[in-house]
């Protein structure tokens, strides 16, 4: 199976098809070569299997929710994102919060059964996104587990099975443009299984890295909540360091987070990547994005949006 896009890491730079990203490019005097500028678009394969909440996502023109339409329109928009310089998107196998920062999450949105098997309909929608990203030369950061859905796994063995199945599916389908955010914000105190929490999450990152097919494996890391610094155990096993800027009001703190990671004894030359930050202020000289770039860290846009079909971002429809 011939694929067009292959992501690699060379020291602290991301490479696509053997060349550093944004080769030779600077932005406002700062080097962006090797960075992976990205946007959190986690609801690309969203569906809601809870009949009590499914109607929340109905389209204004049809009065019904349609997960295939959601993915189809997502894929149709991807070339526009790429034309504007976006090289990476975050897509979730268990989505994210479809109502922004709502605390309870009664919806059922997961590419896994409670036993950890893959749900074919979700995976076919994921296939269409990965195919388009491969065609466009884009990298997909695939988030495997999300704290709004982990309670539906029957036990820890189901989580291990889910991770194994996800990694094998990506590898067996030949995708070279996927990197893993194994657990989204592992230190958020809503996870119910210990292996998804900070003290043990490094086990999952290591497990993902050990799954091979055809001599290939996936690059992997895991994210922590906004303002948090990853544990040394996680940094030591990760291919790249994931951090979040949500809740970080002072752009100077963004640079401090990057420096703190680089000073950790477990750190070695590898990319540092924000893949979630809901602060903008792009018109100002100082903002979180520029602080990240000036510290030579990739930055990721997060806009929760509204459930109005016009300003959705990660809030369907």
Language-model-detected regions and their locations in the chain:
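Aromatic/hydrophobic pocket-lining residues that form the small-molecule binding cavity
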Residues: 70, 74, 119-126, 159-163, ...
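Residue-level detector of anion-binding/catalytic polar loops
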Residues: 87, 137-139, 298
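Active-site-adjacent substrate/metal-binding segments within catalytic domains
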Residues: 5-135
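The substrate-binding groove and active-site-proximal loops of carbohydrate-active enzymes
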Residues: 55-72, 107-123, 145-159, 183-196, ...
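Extended, well-ordered alpha-helical scaffold segments
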Residues: 125, 129, 133-136, 155-166, ...
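Active-site groove signature of glycoside hydrolases
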Residues: 94-96, 136-153, 162-195, 229-230
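Extracellular glycoside hydrolase catalytic/binding regions
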Residues: 161-162, 177-179, 183-317
